Amino acid sequence: MKIFKGKKVYLMDNEFSTATGIAEEEGKIIEIGNFEDLIHKYPEAEKVLSYQNDYIYPGFVEPHSHPMLTSYFLGNCTLIDFKHWDFGKYGVVPACLTRKDMLDRLKKEVSNKEKDAFLFFGYNQQHHGKITAKELDNLEDKKPVVLLYGTGHGVVMNTYAMKKFGFDLIPKDTFGCELTESGDYNGNFTETAYMPYISYLAPVLYNNENLEKGKQLYLENAKVNGIIATAEYMGGGTSGIEKEIEFYQNFSDENYPIHMSFLTNYQHVNNEFNNDNQKTFEY
């Protein structure tokens, strides 16, 4: 057994408690508390003072993936991320480290003539280079081709998709709406030209038939990576408040023991109640 001393140890309980000592045995934390109390309780334990001047925080906390939104991505999109995804018992998806890697995966997917639309997640301009509607039109011009940025804050799409989902109606002077030299849409929409309009993609992106599949992939990936906690910015931003509540009711279990925290998106809830502040507060 070892007892580690920290200047301040932050806990993840409801009171946001702090401590100064961590008791560890066989690779597992068995108790956290006052360092002096712990060394008296476990007098035979080895004292580790290497971190006595350091602040210690919980590890393996995933702060920003939006589990429900990511589950939609994983369930409905083909990955083109520059990161390697390990889904444990469901297999792995190798990284698309280069532009060629990404284009090869795009070409393979759009060759599937049975699909009505082609969604991809993980586009990264730094790794994959600039891509526009023109290049995507060359791959497929009679069905939607949509590349979601890995950040979740942007999209590239072919001309067919722009027209089908209404992105060709976004004011051209909107921040994040990229144009060609001739002043036409080039297929890239980011931030202000994308975030308020993500619901336009609902018919294909928020396909609930594949939500459970995406959820299982998300949980298995979290398990492989040792994730112990995550948070969600609640408020119906993806498919409505009630759907979010249903999704998270049985989110974790004994196979996937992930601690969930929920932060309410006040504006989304307020919109649900026609901007009635009292009803929003009561909800």
Q: Which residues does each predicted region cover?
A:
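Non-catalytic terminal/interface segments that mediate subunit docking, oligomerization
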Residues: F281-Y283
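Divalent metal-binding segments
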Residues: K2-K5, Y10, N14-S17, G21-E25, ...
